[in-house]
Amino acid sequence: MSVAFRRDSDEEHLEPKFEIPIPAGPNMVTQRGLALIQAKVAELEAALPLIEDEAHIVATKRDLRYWRARQATAQLAPAADGDIVEFGCSVRFRRNGKEQLVTLVGHDEAEPASGLISFSAPLSQALMRAEVGDFIAFGGQEDAIEILAITATDRS
């Protein structure tokens, strides 16, 4: 049948709606990350009954599925002691003569511009298990990063 004879409401011609991709691997979270996920689920659940636009309802339901899945699979990481770099730690280091501070967090909590980087990011992986005073290879350079300080973040 010709497209001219189809109703405008046929969903066949709509752009496909994809689910939000869930990062591979474990869903490690800090206490803050778990609280953020729980708050997002509560926010979406509260907003859903108030939405009137069908497209917005569909998008909100999709978002809610994502955040409920993240909440259901969240694994609260054990508290770090700050002796070595591990999930949840803040790390101050020197790279290319510049000092930086990052905190290793879960995927959903990551905000690189704020210094919160995902534990699966290449920089995080390079830093893992390092100790103060260690020099680490990164970006194809030996001794590219010097670990200056490690701080265990509050998980309560």
Task: Describe each region flagged by the PLM.
Residues 78-148:
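Non-DNA-binding regulatory cores of transcription-related proteins
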Residues 3, 15-16, 21-22, 27, ...:
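Short, Lys/Arg-enriched charge-dense amphipathic segments
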Residues 65-81:
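Amphipathic alpha-helical coiled-coil segments
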Residues 148-156:
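Short, compositionally biased
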Residues 1-70:
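Helix-rich terminal scaffold detector
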